[in-house]
Amino acid sequence: MTTPSMEDYIEQIYMLIEEKGYARVSDIAEALAVHPSSVTKMVQKLDKDEYLIYEKYRGLILTPKGKKIGKRLVYRHELLEQFLRIIGVDEEKIYDDVEGIEHHLSWNSIDRIGDLVQFFEESDERSVQLKAIQKKNEQTNQES
């Protein structure tokens, strides 16, 4: 079982490897805004739990288990960003909101949000209807 902190590291490592082909402790530390020694400790724990293989001074690679969860975590993050865009959350708030909620949702909830995103993507009319409801509610709230 992973903790939210472990998930943040696995997600970041997965993204770095996808983007650059590798992930170094210094890259992870910079991306997560943490001290390299904190990264080393977590990487050692993730190695022990078989999410990755870490060799000091040589770098790290994700195991199949680590790749699988990394891919799923990136999907979750991107899906939640997409969902918040669809429902009209201000762009500058989306990243922080996703970071605040992603670890607190079950995978069942994530799958249902995925269904809802698909529902809106399948018909532009649905998004138009949602925006009309939001506009009406904003006007009602301003009048109150």
From Swiss-Prot:
Keywords: Activator, Cytoplasm, DNA-binding, Manganese, Metal-binding, Repressor, Transcription, Transcription regulation. Residues 1-63 form the HTH dtxR-type domain. Pfam families: Fe_dep_repr_C, Fe_dep_repress. It is found in: Cytoplasm. Mn(2+) 1 binds at D8, E99, E102, H103. Mn(2+) 2 binds at E11, H77, E99, E102. GO terms for molecular function: DNA binding; DNA-binding transcription factor activity; manganese ion binding; protein dimerization activity. DNA binding is strongly activated by Mn(2+). The keyword DNA-binding applies. It comes from the Bacteria. SUPFAM superfamilies: Iron-dependent repressor protein, dimerization domain, Winged helix' DNA-binding domain. Gene3D superfamilies: Iron dependent repressor, metal binding and dimerisation domain, Winged helix-like DNA-binding domain superfamily/Winged helix DNA-binding domain. One of its GO terms (cellular component) is cytoplasm. GO terms for biological process: intracellular manganese ion homeostasis. The keyword RNA-binding does not apply. Homodimer. Central regulator of manganese homeostasis. Belongs to the DtxR/MntR family. This is HTH-type transcriptional regulator MntR. It comes from Bacillus pumilus (strain SAFR-032). The gene is mntR.
